[in-house]
């Protein structure tokens, strides 16, 4: 599938999972209901605890979350295929456990990732097929206003600073 681009409707699937902020067991994240009439930023990453994601990509979004939200964004959605328990631990490790507007969702079967046209094959280093790195701005009508899709493992066009400049 071709990568998502400006003007495309943001695809939804309810086959993504999370652990609610109040805790408990993992459950389905009703993406189709949650995103309705909201403006949001999507950040897709290859994997929790991987050096580029943990040291370069996500820290910018965490540090700049108040600034992003001040631009009329309702929340930032982080997507990767790791399970919800790993994502909860990663969010805590990143110092963002209490950031309710930063939502980490698991796409274990890559259904959403495939709809975004953003998979990356990391089999050569033992990681299999993963979510590719990208960032999107989605408006309240569910249309992608801006799409930044990285080549391979780069961390450049999808950084928080570049997304803020487009908000």
UniProtKB/Swiss-Prot annotation:
Topology of this chain in the membrane: Peripheral membrane protein
Chief location of this protein within or outside the cell: membrane
Motif Microbody targeting signal, residue numbers: 165-167
Location(s), subcellular: Peroxisome membrane
Listed GO biological process terms: cell redox homeostasis; cellular response to oxidative stress; hydrogen peroxide catabolic process; methanol metabolic process
Enzyme Commission number(s): 1.11.1.24
Name under which the protein is recorded: Putative peroxiredoxin-B
Organism: Candida boidinii (Yeast)
């Amino acid at each position: 599938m071709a990568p998502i681009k400006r003007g495309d409707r943001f695809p939804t699937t309810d086959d993504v999972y999370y652990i609610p902020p109040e805790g408990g067991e993992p459950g389905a994240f009703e993406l189709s209901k949650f995103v309705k009439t909201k403006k949001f930023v999507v950040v897709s990453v290859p994997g929790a605890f991987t050096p580029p994601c943990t040291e370069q990509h996500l820290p910018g979004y965490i540090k700049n979350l108040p600034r992003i939200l001040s631009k009329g964004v309702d929340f930032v959605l982080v997507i990767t295929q790791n399970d919800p328990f790993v994502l909860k631990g990663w969010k805590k490790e990143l110092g963002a456990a209490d950031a309710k507007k930063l939502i980490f969702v698991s796409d274990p079967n890559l259904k959403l990732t495939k709809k975004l046209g953003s998979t990356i094959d990391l089999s050569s280093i033992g990681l299999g097929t993963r979510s590719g790195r990208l960032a999107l701005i989605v408006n309240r009508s569910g249309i992608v206003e801006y799409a930044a899709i990285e080549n391979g493992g780069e961390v450049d066009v999808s950084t928080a600073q570049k997304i803020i400049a487009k908000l």
